[in-house]
Amino acid sequence: MSNKKADSKPQAKYPVNLLDTPFPMRGDLPKREPQWVKEWEERGIYEKIRAASKGRPKFILHDGPPYANGDIHLGHAVNKILKDIVVKSRNMAGFDAPYVPGWDCHGMPIEIQIEKQFGKSLPAAEVMSKARAYATEQIEKQKVGFKRLGVLGDWANPYKTMNFVNEAEEIRALGKIIEKGYVYRGLKPVNWCFDCGSALAEAEVEYKDRTDPTIDVMFAFAEPEKTAHAFGLPALPRAEGGIVIWTTTPWTIPANQALNLHPEIIYALVDTERGLLIIAQERVEACMADFKLTGRVVATAPGVKLANLRFHHPLASAHPGYKRTAPVYLGDYVTTDTGTGVVHSSPAYGIEDFMSCKAHGMTDSDIINPVMGDGRYIESLPLFGGLSIWDANPKVVDALNAAGSLLRSEKYTHSYMHCWRHKTPIIYRATSQWFAGMDVTPQDGGKTLRETALEGIDATAFYPSWGKQRLFSMIANRPDWTLSRQRQWGVPMAFFVHKETGELHPRTLELLEEVAKRVEQSGIEAWQSLDPRELIGDDANLYEKNRDTLDVWFDSGTTHWHVLRGSHKDQLQFPADLYLEGSDQHRGWFHSSLLTASMIDGRAPYKGLLTHGFTVDGEGRKMSKSLGNGIDPHEVANRLGAEIIRLWIASTDYSGELAISEEILKRVTEGYRRIRNTLRFLLANLSDFDFAQHAVPVDEWLEIDRYAVAFSQQLQTELLGHYEKYEFHPVVAKLQTYCSEDLGGFYLDVLKDRLYTSAADSRARRSAQTALYHLTHGLLRVLAPFLSFTAEEAWKVFQPASDTIFTETYYAYPEVAGSAALIEKWALLRDVRGNVTKALEEARTANRIGSSLQAEVAVHASGARYDALTSLGDDLKFVLITSAATVVKVDDEAQESVDVAASKYQKCERCWHYREDVGAHADHPTLCGRCFSNLFENGEIRSAA
């Protein structure tokens, strides 16, 4: 399409090739983007990408499912857009890279919403139906938000963990790990939330500061003679006293059952005003100061010598219910960093305490566990029955003081575990749960789960690389995985358990498959309504249905099984090439997926893990409601455009925190405009170019055109290397430099004279347009993964017959002979041009010239620069954008310089060059010779620029 402008008389008289384009200067993104979203959906663009990619090697980015609750936030936008960039860049690299989005649907947050709306007394069947409806509604809302961000995917057929087939396959996955021997039932302290009334996964725990009473408590001597002997004394100097512990959880004292010392720490027997006190020797001075006592060390002994001594419970004198003794056990976990070097053990409320007591022969039935699931003590607990443990804290302190056992009490602020949903403090609480054993030897006698998972980490590529050590440390040190939860809205652990022994039914694997078949037809509701007699007949008198549900991290952690090889196996495959999530997922989805795949398949479910950071404001502060520094992606999209969010994400190093503010968005918008203006220039100057009709063969191009294509091809190779490694911010940085400096600041700047003033169909102009055609092909494709709306908009102008840019692959530039030498030569020329531009600016500042075309320059150059400059001949002036340019040879670099002089000639009305031949043709007194030739004769001859 040709649109020659004729806005003024000179242009009408002596026209130049100023063309227009339907690609507007202003993006008007908030208005146009929703139109593209609608068009992509109506025209089935995602399906067309799949059709175009069919038969290519697969690349699978498996979507970590967001939770189906609430509006999408900026963190969602970061995650989904990064995934979109990966998928689009892999498709354009020649892969078949489908994107199946998914949602995590079961679990506490939705159950809480249902309880809030309808109360806690709903029948189970109603909880299920309302939870499904709620999750569906939330998914549809989030789906709209993700589409608005320009994310292409199979939105019509996402995976949902609540779909019947996924629920059924999850039960089958449970059967797999039971069959392999990883699952056991036992009493163990687990993270317990009183508000949830359930165990929590490690990933559901967050830490916040909390102020609690900290107390030092004395356990009185129960075996004075043995104690004296342990310290090498014939007898204790006095009867009063005991061993001293320090704790920040007074509420655990009623459940104390043991004391722990380190075998190698030296303990001192200190004579004080409160009697003889046993404290770690290196803590004596600090403790005496804290207790406001004076003390003399009577004797010392290593912890190992004190093993098995017994001491009275500190509340023994307060109530007969506490008349018991606590034995001394040895534990390597005891330190002298704080406290007394003695740890009191309530095995029901601490993992190390529990393991220590069990190792010393304590059985499950021996363990005292007076705290109920709602956080209250059992009614029968002496002194504190029925109290909340938090309300009991000060009362325990008072009782210890009254019993003469309290040495010190203070307020103490420490980092403490909280439920991520309720933001309330949680505890470790021993409950009977189902576990996946990290160090259990499986049925086949192979490696343990921990060993297999660590090997899986070694075989995985990490982006950035530091993620590897982080996940490795978590797996190496984690406890057994608590699989069970005590809720309704979740996939059931569909076991039949013996009413007396607690053993699983001998046909458990077969029964799980029968349940899975029913769930596949009717959902998890099928288990809720199942009469045990249907499956186990008369055994129903001996066995009961297990009421536990699976940890929701098992839901999402088995998507490699029930999605990649289940509901979406025709599109996806196992293992996935990439999992991509925020850095919190090292203890979340990355973690649970690794454990389940290690149990089921003996390998990791992914070949690569990509981790991104969290969003912060411009000052590096975490976004929060209290600070009022949150940024809503919907608001930004509606005000500036989703493209600006996409460009911000792509241009930020996601391996750290992603800073965003209005000032940052302003800079991103300015960068976007520069790219858009470059595209507009390219499209406008190609609007009268038909490649089939006007293309010039490569070997006939002008030299600068060959350079521009060779340079662009070299840049594309670099960019594709970055895309391959998921390094997006260097892609954006290099493309912005390319648009503003390599194109806008150099090549396109030089090209304007030839494009505008050469004869419309001349070889010189068509050579430039042929190069621009290739550059536009290449540029739009490398922009498309992140500037998706803009690349598509420009593509429809550039290639109107094509359905979409997203079915294209990266551009195959024509080969330019001697490209390396050409790039090297023009790097020298651009360097010289920079010096000339600086000299011209100085002359302009001194009012010696106006525009650069008013100048004539003499470039003094040596060596390779001299050779490069002289090789351009008379075309050098076009490269320097001056009316005349000469080259003067000098001996060395020290003598190089640029002389600038104002031209003494007249300015051509058409090309604005100052030339001696302006007015040489009497009929055209304001026209220079080359413009006359370009308009009325065969046109000027150019070879280089």
UniProtKB/Swiss-Prot annotation:
Motif 'HIGH' region per record, residues: 66-76
Highest taxon of source: Bacteria
EC annotation from Swiss-Prot or TrEMBL: 6.1.1.5
EC top class named in words: ligase
Necessary cofactors: Zn(2+)
Protein residues bound to ATP: 625
Cellular component, GO, one term: cytosol
Pfam families from the UniProt entry: Anticodon_1, tRNA-synt_1, zf-FPG_IleRS
Alphabetized InterPro entries for the sequence: aa-tRNA-synth_I_CS, aa-tRNA-synth_Ia, Anticodon_Ile_BEm, Ile-tRNA-ligase, Ile-tRNA-ligase_type1, Ile-tRNA_ligase, M/V/L/I-tRNA-synth_anticd-bd, Rossmann-like_a/b/a_fold
Family to which this protein belongs: Belongs to the class-I aminoacyl-tRNA synthetase family. IleS type 1 subfamily.
Protein name: Isoleucine--tRNA ligase
Organism of provenance: Burkholderia orbicola (strain MC0-3)
